[in-house]
A protein has these predicted regions:
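Claisen-condensing/thiolase-fold acyl-transfer catalytic domains that form or cleave C-C bonds
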Residues: 66, 70, 96-97, 110-117, ...
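Short acidic, glycine/serine/threonine-rich loops at helix termini
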Residues: 101-104, 132-133, 158-164, 205-206, ...
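Flexible, glycine-rich active-site loops centered on histidine and acidic residues
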Residues: 143-174
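Conserved beta-ketoacyl condensing-enzyme motif
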Residues: 36-123, 253-274
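Acyl-CoA/ACP chain-elongation machinery
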Residues: 151-152, 159, 201-208, 271
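Condensing-enzyme catalytic core mediating Claisen C-C bond formation in acyl metabolism
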Residues: 1-63, 163-241, 245
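Solvent-exposed alpha-helices and their adjacent loops that cap or buttress functional pockets
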Residues: 83, 112, 139-142, 167-171, ...
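Short beta-strand segments
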Residues: 93, 122, 147-153, 179, ...
Length: 335
């Protein structure tokens, strides 16, 4: 309403389009999202600002992503029965980093007292699954006994809250995973990686042009493309079949039939996407138990979504049960 009031003359003249209203009903119908969690709500709902208020911190204080990453990491370490001395590597895998360097992973490593090495990586919404692959490779190669993967996703920071088609998509959260050899695993709950497969396909349909070279051309400052932008319908049309084909092909190569799967923990971007992908993989509609949804509560939490789904829907698994953990997103990327 504020925008339409300010642009009333241009709207009346037909030179500017009026901004349409959004609603809870529209959001739920379009995405399946009913709620979400964000780092700062007040700044977002302030119609004069519509962006989170996250004050800069001094270099002597933990960064925001480090703080949330440490909290998630400590819980993962507790559940896995691991101390800092047991871990040799930290990978921060997320869709955005709040600074280029020093790496958030190295800051988290220092905060936890972990020796070895750490690095940041970004494959957008597939960052967590790509991180798991990197961790698995490190353990198998012998360069690390145990790897901590942390996914601090502050998605509200790159979201355009003026865009009716995407303002509702993302939420903020942090997850953490520990990958190690079965020989050193001590947790009461242990999950074996049977196989993993990564794929990237270049596309401009999901994009964010914010970067350090923006200062070289002031004409783009504040433009919409410096935040999250996507061609949603194109993404749906192109990503869903690619994801289903990758999962189906991987299962076939392993000699696993779809009816052997106990669960599909899919990236939590859109309810309709997950319903279509799971139907193509299973050959029928998946039950809520087979393909659990958590985006109704958390919204799209980028790389953390499938990890949250796994975390909240794993208690009933028995030894020998099989499942697929899959993420997909900008790039395109599928893991």
């Amino acid at each position: 309403d504020n925008y339409n009031d300010e642009q009333a003359e241009q709207i009346a003249a037909g030179t500017v389009a009026a901004m349409p209203h959004s609603s809870a009903e529209f959001v739920e119908k379009a995405s399946g999202i009913k709620s979400r969690y964000v780092m700062n709500k007040d700044g977002i709902i302030d119609s004069k600002r519509m962006a989170p208020r996250l004050p800069e911190r001094s270099n002597e204080v933990q960064s925001i992503q480090c703080e949330m990453g440490v909290a998630a990491a400590q819980e993962a370490m507790r559940q896995a029965g691991k101390t800092a001395a047991d871990i040799d590597s930290v990978i921060v895998a997320a869709s955005n980093m709040q600074r280029p360097y020093p790496a958030i992973a190295v800051e988290i490593q220092d905060a936890l007292g972990i020796k070895g090495y750490g690095f940041d990586m970004n494959v957008a919404c597939s960052s967590a699954t790509f991180g798991i692959q990197q961790a698995r490779d490190a353990v198998r190669a012998g360069s690390a006994r145990s790897v901590l993967i942390v996914n601090p996703e502050i998605c509200s920071g790159h979201l355009n809250f003026l865009d009716r088609d995407s303002h509702f998509i993302f939420g903020d959260v942090c997850t953490a995973i520990i990958v190690e050899s079965a020989a050193t695993a001590t947790s009461d709950e242990q999950y074996s990686i049977v196989d993993s497969k990564l794929q990237t396909i270049f596309s401009n349909n999901i994009r964010n042009n914010f970067g350090f070279l923006n200062r070289g051309d002031e004409s783009g400052t504040g433009a919409a493309d410096k935040l999250f932008v996507q061609e949603g319908r194109k993404v749906f049309k192109e990503v869903c079949p690619a994801v289903a084909a990758q999962i189906s092909g991987q299962l076939e190569s392993l000699g696993i039939s779809p009816d052997q799967l106990k669960r599909l923990w899919l990236h939590q971007a859109n309810l309709s996407m997950n319903q279509l992908i799971s139907k193509r993989v299973l050959g029928r509609d998946a039950s809520a138990d087979e393909a659990p949804i958590i985006l109704d509560e958390y919204a799209n939490t980028s790389s953390a979504g499938s990890i949250i789904a796994f975390h909240k829907h794993r208690a009933d698994l028995s030894s020998g049960d099989l499942g697929v953990l899959c993420s997909f997103g900008a790039g395109y990327s599928i893991g």
